[in-house]
Amino acid sequence: MNWYQLTKKQVLEKLGVTKDGLTSQKAEELLQQNGENVLQEGKRKTALQVFLGQFADLLVIILIIAAIISMFSGNIESTIVIFAVIILNAILGTVQHINAEKSLDSLKSLSSPNAKVIRDGQKIEIPSKNVVEGDLIVLEAGDLVVADGRIINNYSLQVNESSLTGESTNVDKNDGDITAEVPLADRTNMVYSGSLVTYGRAIVAVTGTGMNTEIGKIASLMNAAKEKKTPLQESLDKFSSRLAVIILIISAIVFGLSLLNHMAILDALMFAVALAVAAIPEALGSIVTIVQAMGTQKMAKENAVIKDLKAVESLGCVSVICSDKTGTLTQNKMTVQKIYINGESIFEEELDLNNQSHRYLLYDMVLNNDSSIVDGKGIGDPTEYALLEPLRKLGYNEEDLRSVLKRLEEVPFDSDCKMMSTKYKLHGENHILTKGAIDAILDRCDSIATKDGVRPITEADKADILRQNTEYSENGLRVLTFAYKQTDEELSVDTEYGYTFLGLVSMIDPPREESKTAVADAIRAGIKPVMITGDHKITATAIAKQIGIFKDGDISVTGMELDAMSDSELDSKIEKISVYARVSPENKIRIVEAWQKKGNIVSMTGDGVNDAPALKKADIGVAMGITGTEVSKDAASMVLQDDNFATIIKAVANGRNVYRNIKNTILFLLSGNMAAIFAVVYASLLALPVPFEAVHLLFINLLTDSLPAIAIGMEKPEKDLLAQKPRDPKQGILTKEFSALMLCQGALIAVVTMTAFYIGLQVNAATASTMAFATLTLARLFHGFNCRSKHSIFKIGLTSNVYSLLAFAAGAALLAFVIFVPFMHPLFSIAELTGAQIGFIGLLAFIPTVIIQLVKVIVENVKKSK
């Protein structure tokens, strides 16, 4: 059926819907009958495919080769255990992959769009997945079209359909009839799922949902979802590939040295195998992904939903946050304070319906307004539903007025024209009602409403109005200007002149209680907070001073002043500009680019359709979850579920903490592996027996190491985390300092391991290997406490991370099980140990931790003395 060829009446009849929309009961029946309004995703890998994919890794292939060599050397028990560990690793990798998919799905559901629909005669907001055929959707600028539909009422609607047609220009829509058969791009009385509303408003009858939409027909092409890796994951992949090559080269050298030392070929091969197993950080990739996933889940619980994992890494580098004022730094709870009308400033309670000026102002406040209050809850823009309260306090309801007076035309609010206008028939005459910024409206007025009626406006009147506007603004109040025009002309932005000035309405939107603390935390963290707002410059600066963004010596500029600046002038002033007022979308992009040119990582917040380009341009685009348009959410890499600036600072702290934990986890794993490598190479150079069986090292790497590594990844943010400067994004994890630390700590553990090996050799090779294995395992378990933080354990507290204690206990229990349970001995090539040997192992294993902690204490005391 071609819905676009049917008249509006025919469409409503076929869908069985009236102007009051579907009933809730009918909508629920249709939802059960036709299913949710979602696109079917492209086929995901099955669990078996994911499992088999684990064996395609180069490092795993090296382990398989090691197992085969072990088998040919006659060590069947070790071969079985190596293969068992490889399979266990594949199972863990599969479980982790499936859990990661589930985590991402839950994050997607948190950021999925809502839709405004008319049901039971009332406008309500519902999740887009619950939209059904026959629903009447209310579309406004900034909305994402969530279903296909026929336009029933059109108010200057413009839509971007590039996702379907490839055409990037906006399409003017209408509610007229089309009789001929036309291509999709010419169906101007229809809207399609996946499109973006860029201007205007419309009521649409839904004709297709889910896979029955135009975009659903090509869903199979769109949903071949490719898994994207973050820069850190890609960096670790490259590191693993390079490591595999280095392992092969060093193993070959060790094999050659062993042969030169007249070692048997199979023994030499076992040396090479031991080295390969020692060097491979089997759990590294999985653990890093787990730590990132835990970080994003924690952020989601704290109202910051990460849409792109790259944002987690970038958050730790943020040096500038460009934030909206309204709702982000303020409470977004608008209440009318004072009203300037008839030349005097009055309270809302003093409005009188018998006064013509007051009555027309109330008309403008209530009729020239798209919001409503249902069951005490405001629906729409907070500024707009605040304007409904004065009429309600007079004992009337906005619907009482709207049911009698019908809107004839409208020009929706636009950030360029900074005003909204509608046409109504009042007292038998057509009137245009308008509201907006004073600089957009006052110059359009040629008359003013007074107690004695309407008269021409004078320059003295304008001076009084501007003076009152400044007084309100200096007190941190948001001010809207109201005017009207009696005319039969068609409503248009270009012809909106000849207005009668009605008055100013000031509203207060107090700063959030936590904003001042959050701004102070940002500054302490080396982050420059910048306020960007569409509000008046004086109002914005007053709020910025209250919360600490604007300091002595700082500058505030308007969008027009910014336009007048050259790039070089902006470059020289940008670090002093703390407030941008009355800005355009182009201004926002220019501000982001100017900061980025100076090498900064920039976060930009936004909620409107016109904010999308700036959100994409910023390193981290942050959309508002409550007031944000679906267009802005689609462009952002992070969505704030509470629209709160303080949540951004929490997310920055969490981003820094995730990166720090990953870095500490990698240090723990690689320093432990370096200890094993040093031990094997040392033994090879001195023609000593192989200090470890391959199965020993696999046991350490996969079982006892994994638990402390995950515990390190769960370390809480330290108190001084926000006292540090933002991380340089160009600086990788494997810095010279990191490498030196890794090698030194690895060498310390290797020394005590080889000491235990020498002592064991006095008995026999099996005892030596067992003592080396036990010492290395226990030393690495102790080492988990060292890698929790750069600070000493005395400063952070032994019990501040209970997971690290549990990980140590579990790892030690696993080691004890292998050492003390006889039937495990042949599987792990374990010799029985005496009580003295076990005591000596415990003492040796603890030495590296004592030394490392002692160094940390000395460094802390030196820093304190400075």
Feature annotation, model-predicted:
Residues 728-747, 766-767:
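Membrane-water interface at loop-to-transmembrane-helix junctions
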Residues 757, 763-764:
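Long hydrophobic segments that form regular secondary structure
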Residues 1-723, 733-734, 747, 758, ...:
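Conserved cytosolic headpiece of P-type ATPases
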Residues 752:
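C-terminal catalytic subdomain
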Residues 361, 767-768:
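Alpha-helical scaffolds flanking conserved acidic
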Residues 704, 749, 770-784:
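Generic alpha-helical transmembrane segments
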